[in-house]
Swiss-Prot record:
Name the UniProt record assigns to this protein: US1 protein
Family stated for the protein in its record: Belongs to the herpesviridae US2 family.
Renumbered residue ranges of the record's region Disordered: 230-284
Sequence ranges of Low complexity compositional bias: 256-268
Organism the protein comes from: Equine herpesvirus 1 (strain Kentucky A)
Matches recorded under InterPro entries: Herpes_US2_varicellovirus (IPR003485)
Amino acid sequence: MGVVLITVVTVVDRHKALPNSSIDVDGHLWEFLSRQCFVLASEPLGIPIVVRSADLYRFSSSLLTLPKACRPIVRTRGDTAIALDRNGVVYHEDRMGVSIEWLSVLSGYNHLNSSLIINQPYHLWVLGAADLCKPVFDLIPGPKRMVYAEIADEFHKSWQPPFVCGKLFETIPWTTVEHNHPLKLRAAGGEDTVVGECGFSKHSSNSLVHPPTVNRVIYAVVDPARLREIPAPGRPLPRRRPSEGGMRAPRRRSRAPAPARSTAAAATPPRPGDPRAPAARRAGDVTWMERLLWGVFGRTSTR
């Protein structure tokens, strides 16, 4: 089956931009996000594969408890950068043999979808900055989930994603799971993009207390292709025109009158054996939307 879902865990500044590299963010914030990632990866949606930047080794102690095959790394700074000093904090990388190494997230994604490994559903988690996450949005198609911490500061070097994090949709408390919760009402209404603010309960474990520099932690299901079609609040949908730049406009169809259809045949509903009848959905079939929202409303996501 390969990769059925991708979740990106990262940090954004007040401009909704990602840091260029991991060392641009406080290590304690990465430690907090790695613990969040470890807890959330217990969702029953495929085998969790958590790939991270190698320079987050010191702040990923909780992820090191996963099986070695489930916690690969990517050396975003090359094979020679074993330790980096940033503001007095040393960002150690994994030593040779400690973790499985991927050349990039894209190569690992292709490996999980190949026939070289066991045919199982995989949930790929990506923990890191733009040097690790940018290819996920640029080169891997399809919608992706995001769990990102928003801080009030501004990164000196950053990358602005093609979509706007948390701008088009209001934030919703993520920990509320009542039957009339807005997320469930949205899912029932057929919406396929939701954004929720991950709430922090007073009775939460001390290991999940967020650092004071974090304004909020946002959960989002992002489809960059769909977000480009949705206008900002208060703006109408843009009218589609023939593409410019040498492309020919589509041919006009002939205005010849179409043959009249029998009103009786059109009004008659299709029978089950009729080829016009829609294919009946089997009880075990799961749509991609139900699979995508499974992790939102599943019992293990109500932490």
